[in-house]
Amino acid sequence: MKARVNTCAVQQSCLQSSALGVLGSIAHPVGRPGEYSGRVMQGKSQVAEFSLHAGPDVDATQVTIDLARIAGSPLVGQPYKAHKYSVNSDGYLMLFVSEGLGGFWVQLSSQGTYRSRVVFDSRRLKSGDLFIATLIRPGTHQAKMPRAVAAIRVRAPEASDKAFQPPPPAGMTCTKTGFVPKRLEVYATQGIVFGFETTSRVQIDLTKPAPARSAKSRRSARWRGRPDIRR
C-alpha cells in the first residue's frame, strides 16, 4: 500500500488562525448550555452549516469538526446537509482541516427565542480560545499579530534509525503588548499552542527555510496530524 502524502501540509509556508488550513486547528470553550448554529465559510463563500447542542448532561467534553469533510455547496434551492453535534457545556469545540487548500473560518451563533446572536468568530480569537499550529518545515518562521511579531525556529530531527517522536506542544501567549515569549524553538511536527489574553489573530510565515540536508543525515519526521494538547 502506498503512503498517502498530504501535499498541502508539506508545501504550506503560511498558517493563519483566521483562515484555517491543514496545519492549524482551533479549540473554543463552549461555556454555556444552549442551542447553537454554526456557519462554515471558505473565503467569502458559505460551504456548510451545523447545529450544536451544549448541555451539562452531555458526556462528550470535546466535539471535533473537520471543516474540509463537511464543506460542500448544496444544489440550487436546496438546504445545506444537516450536521448535528453535541458537547458538554463545559467542553470544547475543536475545528480543523484534514485536506485541501484551507481558508476556512467559522461563526457560531446562540439560538434565542426571537433572534440569534454571534458568540464566536474564528477570525477573532478571544480569551480562552486556543490556536494550535504544527510547523513541519525547518527554518526560521515569524509569528505575527496586528501589532506584534515573534521569532520561531523550527529544528529538523537528528538523524536516527528510529521514527521521530515529537515532544509535547510548546506554548505562546498573545497579550495586549505582544507575544510571550518573543522567541521560541521547536522541532518539526512538535506543535505550538497559542493562548489568548486579548482578542486577536495569528499568522505564521516561513521567512528563511533551513538548508537542505543530505539523505543520510535526515531523520523521518512524519506529520501525524494535530498534536495532542491534553498531554
Tell where the protein language model's regions lie, with residue ranges.
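Extracytoplasmic copper-binding redox domains, predominantly the cupredoxin/blue-copper superfamily
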Residues: 1-231
